[in-house]
């Protein structure tokens, strides 16, 4: 179920979600290297360096989880919070809970179950470590330095020089050498030149105006051009940064693309036709399967309806079971109380102190009964005496009344 839910989440997030862990792991490894984790953690713990995809792929869950806990504790302490180094015998759930508490204290949200961290790999593990590393960089006020660009060495193209080809630099050097060698031979008298020029101008001005005609022989001119032409060739060194080179390359690439497009267009059209035919076959096959399985689909729907009804009845029965379970719990609690009272009474009955008290009470009761018997006897005796005394008095009174009657009768 967990794999299915994970695949469903990846489908919702897009096709690139499966590779997010690899990107986060690469960023995390760069940050750990900036924090010198190799010297402060690996050498002290005698561990191997992490690979580029250590926490992105499952290798050894126990080792990965221990490395995750070790790096988390080191980063938390380096960020300014106190956190004990986890040990191998510690409870993993408690360790994960403490790590997530520290993550929340830094202001990060935790929207995944803690069991994802218990595996020791995955996007959540990389996320937690990346957050801690980011907090450490903020705590130490890490700042990036300006990049230093290496000096690019221009590739000097070797130019093959023929006897008929000259470079600009060589031409300039030769011209400078000729000027320096012939400085003494080519002095010009400016005054004489100016006088000669004025004389020629005067002669030309004196001549009547006429049409100028060329006296040059065409054949000799062509021969001279062919003789001088090889020496006039100049090789210009190409610069890779020249925009003309880039334009030529663009034209070449465009021509190559056009050529490749002409070749591949036929294959693409053929592939398009094959895909269209395959889709048509799939759609027809799908219709055929739907027609064949229509009865089974209806049976499946009826089975689904029966299943939903059974689930509803089960929920109702579960509600009654829950109520009876609650009543049973109450009765069990009362039974436990009665058992406890019985145990207390049984323990008190086995004790000898109440028996002694009962014997003392019986003895006292017997003594009181004896006293009551004595008092009863005294009362009966007193009552008997009073009765006898009253009876004697009545007898005497009766005798006293009978004597006058007898005397009256005698007379």
UniProtKB/Swiss-Prot annotation:
Keyword NADP in record: no
GO biological process: apoptotic process; intraciliary transport; non-motile cilium assembly; regulation of apoptotic process
Keywords associated with the record: Apoptosis, Cell projection, Cilium, Coiled coil, Cytoplasm, Cytoskeleton
Superkingdom classification of source: Eukaryota
Coiled-coil region list: 261-351
Protein location: Cytoplasm, Cytoskeleton, Cilium basal body
Stored InterPro entries: Ig-like_dom, Intra-flagellar_transport_57
Main location: cytoplasm
Pfam family, one: IFT57
An annotated GO cellular component: cilium
Annotated stretches, region: pDED: 317-408
Known role: Required for the formation of cilia. May also have pro-apoptotic function.
PANTHER family per UniProt: IFT57/HIPPI (PTHR16011), INTRAFLAGELLAR TRANSPORT PROTEIN 57 HOMOLOG (PTHR16011:SF0)
Family: Belongs to the IFT57 family.
Protein's name in the database: Intraflagellar transport protein 57 homolog
Organism: Xenopus laevis (African clawed frog)
């Amino acid at each position: 179920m967990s794999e299915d839910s994970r695949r469903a989440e990846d489908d919702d997030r897009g096709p690139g979600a499966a590779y997010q862990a690899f990107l986060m792991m690469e960023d995390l490894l760069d940050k750990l290297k900036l924090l010198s984790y190799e010297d402060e953690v690996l050498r002290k713990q005698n561990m191997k360096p992490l690979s580029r995809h250590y926490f992105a792929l499952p290798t050894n869950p126990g080792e990965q989880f221990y490395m995750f806990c070790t790096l988390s504790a080191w980063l938390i302490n380096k960020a300014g919070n106190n956190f004990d180094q986890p040990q191998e015998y510690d409870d993993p759930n408690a360790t994960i809970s403490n790590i997530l508490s520290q993550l929340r204290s830094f202001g990060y949200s935790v929207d995944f179950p803690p069991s994802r961290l218990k595996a020791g790999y995955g996007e959540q593990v990389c996320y937690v470590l990346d957050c801690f590393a980011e907090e450490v960089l903020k705590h130490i006020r890490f700042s990036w330095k300006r990049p230093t660009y290496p000096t690019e060495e221009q590739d000097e193209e070797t130019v093959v020089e023929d006897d008929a080809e000259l470079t600009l630099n060589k031409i300039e050097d030769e011209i400078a050498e000729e000027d320096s060698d012939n400085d003494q031979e080519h002095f010009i008298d400016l005054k004489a030149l100016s006088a000669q020029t004025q004389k020629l101008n005067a002669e030309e001005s004196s001549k009547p105006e006429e049409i100028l005609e060329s006296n040059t022989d065409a054949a000799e001119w062509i021969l001279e051009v062919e003789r001088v032409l090889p020496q006039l060739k100049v090789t210009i060194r190409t610069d890779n940064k020249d925009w003309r080179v880039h334009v030529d390359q663009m034209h070449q690439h465009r021509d190559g693309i056009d050529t490749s497009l002409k070749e591949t267009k036929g294959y693409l059209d053929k592939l398009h036709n094959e895909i269209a035919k395959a889709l048509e076959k799939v759609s027809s096959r799908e219709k055929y399967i739907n027609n064949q399985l229509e009865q089974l689909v209806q049976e499946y729907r009826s089975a689904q309806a029966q299943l939903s009804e059974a689930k509803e009845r089960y929920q109702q029965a579960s509600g009654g079971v829950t109520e009876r379970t609650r009543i049973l719990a109450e009765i069990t609690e009362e039974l436990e109380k009665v058992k406890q009272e019985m145990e207390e009474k049984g323990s008190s009955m086995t004790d000898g102190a109440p028996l002694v008290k009962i014997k003392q009470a019986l003895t006292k009761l017997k003594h009181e009964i004896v006293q009551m018997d004595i008092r009863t006897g005294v009362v009966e005796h007193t009552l008997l005496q009073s009765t006898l005394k009253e009876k004697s008095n009545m007898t005497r009174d009766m005798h006293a009344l009978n004597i006058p009657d007898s005397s009256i009768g005698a007379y």
